[in-house]
Amino acid sequence: MINNAIARRYAKALVQLGSEKDLIDRFSQELKVVSGVFAGNAELRAAFGNPAFTADQKKQIMRDLIARMQCSELVANFLLLLVDKNRVVCLPEIVETYEKLADEQSGVIRPMITTAFALDDSQVNAIKGALEQKTGKKVVPQVKVDQSLIGGVVTQIGDIAYDSSVKTQLARIHDILQKG
């Protein structure tokens, strides 16, 4: 819970800065790359959690990473601030929260569209268009296949699910027949 509050505070500040400078998308890309490097490198994560490394050593490690990733000055300063405040371990949560806040700021939703079979581009675009019309927001869909649905589509937008799968319809019929 504490990490969520911390992540939200840092992410909110960075979204505000990105919005002022019209750099929300660039910040997002840079943060994803840096977070991906941390996620894929256990030694790097361990170094920032290890008290044997001094603050200066941790800053130098971060500077080297920033240089290799060619981060913008603002993201570089943000990452160095995380080192100063000993919050690098919160980076995954900060990036996740940043993405959510940036999407809210930009009027973007990222629904999860689950189908029993793979969709072609025209089908995805049709669903995307319907969702954009319904929500009034830009839709960036994520599509996955779950053959257990048998047929139909389940669309998850945040906490709301639109379930028109055959699996759910069969379950409802089963419940009705059971109740008699």
From Swiss-Prot:
Keyword Transport: yes
Transmembrane segments: none
Coiled coil: none
Mode of membrane association: Peripheral membrane protein
Keyword terms: ATP synthesis, Cell inner membrane, Cell membrane, CF(1), Hydrogen ion transport, Ion transport, Membrane, Transport
Domain of life: Bacteria
Gene Ontology MF terms: proton-transporting ATP synthase activity, rotational mechanism
Localization (cell): Cell inner membrane
Predominant location category: membrane
Cell membrane is among the record's keywords: yes
A GO CC term attached to the entry: proton-transporting ATP synthase complex
Protein family according to the UniProt entry: Belongs to the ATPase delta chain family.
Self-association state and partner proteins as the record states: F-type ATPases have 2 components, F(1) - the catalytic core - and F(0) - the membrane proton channel. F(1) has five subunits: alpha(3), beta(3), gamma(1), delta(1), epsilon(1). F(0) has three main subunits: a(1), b(2) and c(10-14). The alpha and beta chains form an alternating ring which encloses part of the gamma chain. F(1) is attached to F(0) by a central stalk formed by the gamma and epsilon chains, while a peripheral stalk is formed by the delta and b chains.
HAMAP family, per database record: ATP_synth_delta_bact
Entry function: F(1)F(0) ATP synthase produces ATP from ADP in the presence of a proton or sodium gradient. F-type ATPases consist of two structural domains, F(1) containing the extramembraneous catalytic core and F(0) containing the membrane proton channel, linked together by a central stalk and a peripheral stalk. During catalysis, ATP synthesis in the catalytic domain of F(1) is coupled via a rotary mechanism of the central stalk subunits to proton translocation. This protein is part of the stalk that links CF(0) to CF(1). It either transmits conformational changes from CF(0) to CF(1) or is implicated in proton conduction.
Annotated PANTHER family: ATP SYNTHASE DELTA CHAIN
Descriptive protein name: ATP synthase subunit delta
